From Swiss-Prot:
PANTHER family: HISTIDINE AMMONIA-LYASE. The gene is hutH. It holds the Pfam family Lyase_aromatic. This is Histidine ammonia-lyase. Pathway: Amino-acid degradation; L-histidine degradation into L-glutamate; N-formimidoyl-L-glutamate from L-histidine: step 1/3. Belongs to the PAL/histidase family. Contains an active site 4-methylidene-imidazol-5-one (MIO), which is formed autocatalytically by cyclization and dehydration of residues Ala-Ser-Gly. InterPro entries: Aromatic_Lyase, Fumarase/histidase_N, HutH, L-Aspartase-like, Phe/His_NH3-lyase_AS. GO terms for cellular component: cytoplasm. GO terms for molecular function: histidine ammonia-lyase activity. There is a cross-link at residues 142-144 (5-imidazolinone (Ala-Gly)).
């Protein structure tokens, strides 16, 4: 596994993407003095005996209850065990790993009062690929992602289960086999570990990285569909988009121009085409996809900031031994970012489905009905378009903003919450749905371009069509469609479609690949 030096507070989206893809984070040693100073500040606060929330008091509605000095370790263990109350399927290992790395970076900024040895255990778990089993349901996004982060922390004290390279095991068994030892949590450490937005942020970042591949694949499929339908590249003329000035629209139009450059199919109808304008699903790709790109970039900016922040409570300022209670655990920024990603993903899939519908309709595409040479005897792409419609409809239902909901918790002490966890968790499924739609479009567009042979598309799009044809032959007669669709979906999901387009530069959402 690749090792990545993690600089707390200064990590890039490319860093987080690399960790999501499997890189192992190793803390920059420059953060050590701040970690040590923060832990020492907590020790001095404890010694003073004054009431400080989360250090020597109860939690939430029970904040007014003072805890004796002899019970402080028990207090931290109790909050972890009592708050590990999530339900549902475990979060995916890659996202759980990212969550742990986000928590590691937050604690290492020296504002949480966590001792070096506790932080070192979290880092060692990542290095050994010992990943807590974390039920994915149970967070309302304030006060932080309490339940899921408690499940993560429970493993650190020897409770719960882990995923390891060798399978799923009780935490204590996994620790022994990897030479790890559970930690006894000190004052404030349990609260610092389980309070924060890292669960929601990890899910949102994972979806962002997958949405980047989705967006680029949709551009490739859209360009191929434009050629399949003998659509015009005139709507991608830069002069149109420079007048409107939206960056995403300008870059999307440029990418579409570059993808189609040199297409013999396009040149075959440049002169004498009786169609004056294409349907919106072709003509307005820069406007729709460009808007999606801009929204995804805004979400990326928000999540990049959040990933570099400290979001537990209270926060420790070692320079004057101050513990300040605030609300950095409130995940409203993450909830808004997740809602933005949901809207963009929904529209990317929606536009793709409209192109599929256009291609299978002979009145719009000029090609055989449902892209089959013998319509009637064969149904061709009839039901794949129905499947695409079903997936798009499901995404539209899921795209309703999560951030507008709130249910008070903790006896109304926590009376407004973000619902960021739900908003972020739904995104991976939405991206999967949209990925399937793009895969179906890829098959339909390749089929359409086949009908124009011997005319060929551009070099970039021909490479994509040949990639498809290497796995899925032209559809002459009806056959079992599902395996073909799965192969095309896998091409989109893996980024193979984008790579096949070669040197054509496609806009990026989250920094360098």
């Amino acid at each position: 596994m690749t090792e990545l030096t993690l600089k707390p507070g200064n990590a890039t989206l490319a860093d987080w993407r690399a960790i999501y893809r499997g890189a192992v984070p190793k803390l920059d040693e420059a953060c050590r003095p701040k970690i040590k100073a923060s832990a020492e500040a907590v020790a001095r606060i404890v010694a003073k005996g004054e009431p400080v929330y989360g250090i020597n008091t109860g939690f939430g509605k029970l904040a007014s209850v003072r805890i004796p000095a002899g019970d402080l370790e028990t207090l931290q263990r109790n909050i972890v065990l009592s708050h590990a109350a999530g339900v549902g399927e475990p979060m995916p290992v890659a996202i759980a790993r990212l969550m742990m790395a986000l928590k590691l970076a937050s604690l290492a900024q020296g504002a949480s009062g966590v001792r070096p040895e506790t932080i070192d255990l979290l880092q060692a778990m990542l290095a050994n690929d010992v990943i807590p089993v974390v039920p994915a349901q149970g967070s309302v996004g304030a006060s932080g992602d309490l339940a899921p982060l408690s499940h993560m922390t429970a493993v650190m004290i020897g409770v719960g289960e882990c995923f390891t390279p060798h399978g799923r095991f009780p935490a204590k068994v996994a620790f022994v086999s990897h030479g790890l030892e559970p930690v006894t949590l000190g004052a404030k450490e349990g609260l610092a570990l389980l309070n924060g937005t890292q669960f929601s942020t990890a899910y949102a970042l994972a979806a962002l990285f997958e949405a980047e591949v989705l967006y680029q694949s949709a551009l490739v499929a859209g360009a191929l569909s434009t050629d399949a339908a003998k659509g015009s590249d005139a709507p991608f003329d830069p002069r149109i988009h420079l007048l409107r000035k939206h960056r995403g629209q300008i870059e999307t139009a440029e990418a579409l121009r570059n993808l189609m450059a040199g297409s013999a199919i396009r040149e075959s109808h440049r002169v004498g085409d009786e169609r004056v304008q294409d349907p919106y699903c072709l003509r307005c790709q820069p406007q729709v996809m460009g808007a999606a790109l801009d929204v995804l970039r805004k979400a990326a900016d928000t999540l990049g900031t959040e990933a570099n922040g400290v979001t537990d409570n209270p926060l420790i300022f070692a320079e004057d031994d101050t513990a300040l209670s605030g609300g950095n655990f409130h995940a409203e920024p993450v909830a808004f970012a997740a809602d933005m990603i949901a809207l963009a993903v929904c529209e990317i899939g929606s536009l793709s489905e409209r192109r599929i519908a256009m291609l299978v309709d002979p009145a719009l595409s000029g090609m055989p009905a449902f892209l089959t040479p013998k319509p009637g005897l064969n149904s061709g792409f009839m039901i794949p378009q129905v499947t695409a419609a079903a997936l798009v409809s499901e995404n539209k239902q899921k795209a309703y903003p999560a951030s507008v909901d709130s249910i008070p918790t903790s006896a109304n002490q926590e009376d407004h919450v973000s619902m960021a966890a739900h908003g972020a968790r739904r995104l991976i499924g939405m991206v999967e749905n949209a990925t399937a739609v793009i895969g179906i479009e890829l098959l339909a567009a390749a089929q359409g371009c086949d009908f124009h042979q011997p005319l060929a598309s551009s070099d970039a799009l021909e490479a994509v069509r040949k990639l498809v044809r290497a796995e899925v032959p032209h559809l002459d007669n009806d056959r079992h469609f599902h395996p073909d669709m799965e192969k095309a979906i896998a091409m989109v999901r893996s980024g193979a479609t984008v790579r096949a387009a070669g040197a054509v530069a496609l806009p990026s959402i989250a920094g360098a690949a």
